[in-house]
Amino acid sequence: MKINKIILFFFLSCLYLFSSSVSAQQLLGEIEITEKSFTIDASVINTKINYLIDNTITKPKLSVTSIFGEATSIDDILRISDDKKSLTFGDYTSSTLSSSNKLVSKINLNSLILISFSTIITFGLFTKNNPRSSSKPLLFIVLLICISIFNLSNSIKISEVSVRIDIKVPSTFKFDSLILTLGSGSSIINGLIASSLKIDGCTTNSKDHSIELNQISISSELNICSTKEININEIQLTSTNVKLNLTSSSNVNLDFHNGYSGSFSINTNDLTLDSACETFKDSNTGIIIGTCNGGSDNSKLSITAITGKTVVSNAEITCPIDNSWRVTVGADNVPPSPSIITSQPATDFIFKKNDLVYMAQYGYSNQSITDGPVENSFIVSYPAYIPPSNFLVSKIIGSPTFKANVKYQFSISVKLGQPLGSFNRIQNMSLYFFNPRDITDPINGASQYYELKDTIPLFVHTFEGNFTSNTEFALTKIEFTPTVDIGTSIFGLRIFRTGFTGGDVVTVIIKDMKFTILPKTITQPTLLIKDSELVNLPKPSTSFDPQDSSTCPYLANDLVHWHNPSTWPNGIIPSPSSNITLPEGKKVLISPCSISQTQVYKWIKVPSTSELIFADSPMDFHVKDIYVEGKFIMGTTKCRYNSKINIIFHGEKTLSDTISQYYGSKGIGVSSSGFISVHAKQYHNTWSKLSASAWSGDYVVYIQDNVNWEVGQKVVVITSYYQDEDNNQNEVMTIAAIQGKTIQFTEPLKFFHYGGQEYQAEIALLTRRITFQSSDVNQFGGHVMVMGEGQFAGLGLIGMGQRNIKARYPLHYHLGKVLKNSYISDCSVTNSYYRCYTIHGTNNVTLTRNVAFDVSGHCYYLEDGVEMDNTISFNLAAYVHPIGRPAAGPSQIGEVFVESDNLRQPADCAASGYYITNAWNKIIGNTASGGWAGYAFPNLDKPIGNHRTVQMIPKAYSTKVFEGNTGHSSGHFFITGATIYVGANLTYNEVDGLLYYDSGRFERFTYKNGTVVYGNEVPMRFNNTKIYLSNFGIGHWGEYVEVVSYESHDNIRSASIFGEAWLSKAIVNGNSNNIARSINFNKQGFQYYDTYVKTVLSNISFRNYIRNPKSLNDEDDNRAIISMTHGDVFKPQGISTARAISFVNVAKSQIVGHQVLPTSGSRYFNFIDWDSSITGKKPGQPALVGSHELWYKFDNTCEYNSDWTCHICEKGNKEIANIQFIIPGLIDDGVLVYDSFENLNVGNISLFGSGITERRSTIVTKNQGVTGVSNMGWYLYLKAGSPKYMKIWLSQVVYGQHIFLALPYPTQTTFIIKSNYIWGSAINYNHVFSLASSAADVRSGNGTKYYFDGNFLYVKLVNLVLTGDPSEYYERDGVKVYWVRNSFSVSIEATNTVTPPTSDGFFKNLPDNLPSSSL
């Protein structure tokens, strides 16, 4: 048994070694081709020949790869002649191996190994103890078989060998002669340049060899014979004396690159020849002869395909090479527009399975709605024993929309899944339209639970129908008329059965469930005559750019044609697969016929002395890379092209620099010495706004501006919805007709788009005559990167940009420093994988009148923080998407994102329409829709990227000009997000080399010219700004800001501005007439901040803040002005003022919202109504508004407003004051204590004197700071007792004001009281207080005296440093807000030897009695 196993192992080893000796796909070797005349004889072998252009090599080479057969080395099957000019295939295994051709074949080696191995085993077996083993004869047989096999395999059968021959040459190499003698197989020859090419596949054997030639260039002779089909595509004849002889037993397809001029003789069964050739048939031979393009016999074409078909194409010379010839210039052919329709057809809005969610009290699952049996149908399944009511809820919010008092139609076809019975009988159905906040979210909700309780829908309509058949669908069609406009709503169809289901599942099949907007006559509505009530939104000039056709670049008389062989140094027009460098010093003109419009050009370089100029004629140009050191011209400022020219960029995703070093791949790179100019027809305006609202089902819209848009072009109608990213209501439409400012679409609108007086949806043109676009490969589009001057106008960029690869953006000025005449005007970017228009390390560039739609990452992008003095004007950015998970985070904190492969610029988690790292640029007349923010001003402490070593502070620069900009539908990802967001922090980490982006609150100090010097501070200024449908309209975390002339509509909050902040000349409108607005959110006009700011509101009209009885509290309700009451550690000082405030459709109860909480933020809330325009207290005179605490009831003018939960008083000679008690161990300086109210409470402070007898007090906590009314007595009582030492910062006791402070102490206490000013001064403010004669003497004194009456210590707190200088307050519009500064303090040190303080430093057990009311 053991010997049999050995024999089996031995035999299998033999077979394995034999099979390995004939394995395929093995590189046999390479040969360098050194001669320009070369012959290959492969007549005895099957070959697959590939001729390839390879610019990675400098000399031609030939490689041979085994496909099938026994060859293991090229020495086995070919020989090269001594003169290196020919190569012959054959069986050379029996030849004697020379010293220069040392080869031991794999087969011979295998044979040697196997025979040696066999001998050893055989010897061992024969010498074993059992000489009679019957296995020995079998072993001999196996051994003989193996030896025979390997002897047989040692001899190659060349006829059974198949190889691939790859001939690779650099693109500039030209053969004088290439001769191929072929056996069976195939040949594909691409890009060959030769004087003579001969391919013989006929004479040596009868085996078939197919031949395909693509884009070859021949200057003398082409001779091909094949028994199979011959295909020649785009052959280029580079002289006027070329002989072509083609012979085939099958078909011949001959395609010329630029025509053929010469004679021909064709013998074929079937001939197709284009009209450029004159033919006649020889009556004797039947051969067709003639000439093409009037040519002579200098060039001759002979084709023999007697049994086959011959096609000769593109024989016409469409591209003459005469330098004076020009292609016909493209005309400005504007498609005629039909008349605008006067009646609108019906429009159906069908609900399919994936549009709906099943909701009920219970009994729901993800199988409640499944696919139906026919188109537009679905099955509703009811499990056992469930209640009789359920909803089918639409996932499509806001489509369709319905006008009040207009008739609409709803239809549904129903078939029961089982015969009608008591468990599946449908009693009725109802159309419900819900406010989104009143129903489970059908899109993002995690539950299907819904129970109709006390919810009041926007509209409901109940109907009965034919719901009884289980054999066929029964149609129910009803009409309904809404009583209210229905915009942002969630539609639910309630199906109400007569009872619970039984023990079995029942089903209902529904088909063609739809709303129908009925046909109507189109009547032009009343159109807007201005776009804003208050702000002035500038518009670009109505003039078109002046044109002068005589200056067009293609008319120059010193141009040479791309398609002229003499243009090129080697006399050969380069093939697309080659690396092409334009000849030095030449201006090369490309016409449509100059190039292949289907082949992909690999790489084109324009040297510094050369120019590549395109004709103004329609063409498609497929290319991978273009590198421009000279000039790339496709139109100029004064010669815009009318033709449709399309450049399509190709290439797989790579990080390699295939254009040139640092320029990446798949696009155009323009060096610092280069210049690019692309100018297509000017469409103006590139975007406009609606002049009337457009409804679901509308075909016709009305716009505000004259435009020259065209039938067939695409436009986008921008959303009128808040949460743009969650519910895309931007609609791309095609123009069917256009007349003046009226546009008709080919399809109806699905959504409502608002065009009211408050604001209007934008409409933007997407189509352009010249386009750059990409073959879509893994979000790896083309890009244009310009380091020199670049001018672009009227260019469309589609599917461009390379996701998460820096510097690979659709259109990009890169490290250009200060440019002189560069701009991007009236261009469009759509469906971008990475940004829109980028300015990087470049100044003095203009981006104007451009459009961008559907973009990932920041759109208009200033990259490193050094970009200044650029103009960004009259542009549109819409539907901008954060990359990855959008930044969120609690409150003001935000989140930190770190640079990674999936988020190369971490700030893209908060992608914006306009990303402005340095504010010293002109931002004028733009609009932004969507995105995390519309306009983002991140904080950069220093530049990033290529400019990390530049010494500047980008965030220190203020706005150069920010004028007339609008934004909407953004800010909703972050609780304090805003459409204009001045916040977040972007830093470069020197340790790990990565960017870090923190999306939250960061302070920002801005200075004149960015020079950080005290006294040089200037505000960021935002003029004539309109923000709507936003979270916070403007969010500014900086220190200096002015917002002047501002409209806020439908924002959750109009603005959140900090530091020295002025909001003036504004309309703050809580609710517009836009039915698509966010009705599911409460809104507040403005929230006063809670500490260390100076806020002035002036000349503001608050409108349409309507009470919501379901609000959580007064701050959550729809109020015009609200407090900030969330915490104890931050104490409001006298920091908030207002003047000239008015209200429209705001009930008095909704003017102020103050939430009563046990926090210092709530207790100390206050503001000054400078002219009583808010309170109506004493018109023209200032009023003081204080919180709910009696502490603010400082005189008899004070009244408590229960709606506001605030006191309203005449201000008189009072001001808001703030002092900060520092008591070691109780109230520590600079320590923030977060704890419960009970643990924070350390005592109280009360008003006294001025006739006050009752307690008017508030709580004092462990967090420093007490705010109240100045020129009043303040009595401090601490539960721990009065301290032996305390310091009092006079943080805000303004000039001319004081606080008369009283504290209880035990009798016989003595005091040392001092004042201290922490800064140096020529005047001594450090005093030791003297003992006065009475409390009255202290109060009437200068603030350097004290008095102790045996019960109370009296000190008058006066900030002795103040003089009333304007530097002590912030003033705008005649309104002052005083500084809060901890620089002047008063310290009190108490000593009592009779009743000493306890060890913790307090005098205990003191009575709590108010000082005299007569003081």
From Swiss-Prot:
Stretch forming the signal peptide: 1-24
UniProt keyword annotations, A-Z: Glycoprotein, Membrane, Repeat, Signal, Transmembrane, Transmembrane helix
Cellular component annotations (GO), alphabetically ordered: membrane
Family from the record: Belongs to the comF family.
Membrane-crossing residue ranges in chain numbering: 107-127, 138-158
Membrane-topology descriptor: Multi-pass membrane protein
PANTHER family named in the record: G8 DOMAIN-CONTAINING PROTEIN DDB_G0278975, G8 DOMAIN-CONTAINING PROTEIN DDB_G0288475-RELATED
InterPro entries: CEMIP_beta-hel_dom, G8_domain, G8_domain-comF-like
KW Nucleotide-binding (keyword) present: no
Cellular location(s): Membrane
Main location (coarse class): membrane
Highest taxon of the lineage: Eukaryota
Protein name: G8 domain-containing protein DDB_G0278975
Domain G8: 566-692
Glycosylation sites: 245, 366, 428, 466, 579, 844, 985, 1009, 1023, 1099, 1244, 1342
PbH1 repeats: 819-841, 842-864
